[in-house]
Amino acid sequence: MNKQELNKLIGKNVKKYRLLYNTKNKNKITQAKLSEMLGVHMSLVAALESDNSTQGISIYNLYQISKILNVRIDKFFEGDV
């Protein structure tokens, strides 16, 4: 797997687990809310979750997302692009 494919996989899984979180919780986390919680611009989260994105993310931000969504960090590396 190359860098672009890895970035796509991570982005796909961030979106998947954010939407899954929203189905299970009353307090929804939108892209805007997630970006606010991370302290990044919303365009970064939108680009990350985009189906054709190759936007990367820092390991620190990925760690923060895993804590916010209550998902083990290794889950973001599972699956196919």
For every predicted segment, state its role:
Residues 1-27:
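A short, Lys/Arg-rich alpha-helix, primarily the initiator
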Residues 12, 28-29, 57-60:
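Residue-level signal for the short linker/turn that defines the boundary of a DNA-recognition helix
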Residues 18, 35, 66:
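The alpha-helix within a helix-turn-helix
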Residues 25-48:
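Short alpha-helical DNA-recognition segment
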Residues 31, 42, 59-62, 73:
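Helix-turn-helix DNA-binding elements, focusing on the entry/boundary residues of the two helices
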Residues 52-64:
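Short, basic-rich loop-to-helix N-cap that marks the start of a DNA-contacting helix
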Residues 57, 70-81:
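Short C-terminal boundary/hinge segments that cap the last helix of small helical domains
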